[in-house]
Swiss-Prot record:
Transmembrane segments: none annotated. This is Large ribosomal subunit protein uL6. This protein binds to the 23S rRNA, and is important in its secondary structure. It is located near the subunit interface in the base of the L7/L12 stalk, and near the tRNA binding site of the peptidyltransferase center. It comes from Deinococcus deserti (strain DSM 17065 / CIP 109153 / LMG 22923 / VCD115). GO terms for molecular function: rRNA binding; structural constituent of ribosome.
Length: 185
């Protein structure tokens, strides 16, 4: 048995689930999500918990067991609590602001970079150097946060750029560290 696949998924109050052939629908206070899954697997509700079961120990079923359980758990958590990814800007003059729903970044280019959020994702700027990307779909929130970071990845020499909060950047030594001091070649 898959260690992840056999774990039950707790369904919080206020969340309704519906399973039809190959489609799992979950509705909660934050919204509604649909997760397609392999119809060979079964998702059943038992005492306020969801269980994902596989019909056999074939390689295909074993591979899909843990994946399906994780996708369903993320959907349940998304409609009840939601997901937030925090980003921070490092660099002199780097700042972010909201322009309507769009995120406007001033990050060292000759022009501000404007990023429109896709449906289901919202931006928040609690401070000029902090960005919160939030939504109910974990994959979409992560992809949008990665796209924002991609606009100006952290520099390897100074650490300037857009990074995830808590992300450690291994800085390179630079010219002085590479030659061993002044004047030596």
């Amino acid at each position: 048995m898959s260690r992840i696949g056999k774990q039950p998924i707790a369904v919080p109050s206020g969340v309704t689930v519906n399973t039809q052939s190959g489609v799992f629908k979950v509705k909660g206070p934050k919204g509604e999500l649909t997760v397609p899954f392999n119809p060979d697997l079964t998702i059943r509700e038992d005492n306020g918990q969801l269980l994902v079961e596989r019909p056999s120990d074939r390689q295909e079923h074993r591979a899909l067991h843990g994946l399906t359980r994780t996708l369903v758990a993320n959907a349940v958590k998304g409609v009840s609590d939601g997901f937030v990814i925090n980003l921070e800007l490092r660099g002199v003059g780097y700042r972010a602001k909201l322009n309507g729903k769009a995120l406007e970044l001033t990050i060292g280019y000759s022009h501000p970079v404007v990023i429109d959020p896709p449906a289901g994702v919202t931006f928040a700027v609690p401070e000029p150097t902090k960005i919160d990307v939030s939504g109910i779909d974990k994959q979409l929130v992560g992809q949008v946060a990665a796209n924002v970071r991609e606009v100006r990845k952290p520099d390897a020499y100074h650490g300037k750029g857009v990074r995830f909060v808590g992300q450690q950047i291994a800085l390179k030594a630079g010219k002085a560290g590479a030659t061993g001091g002044k004047g030596k070649k």
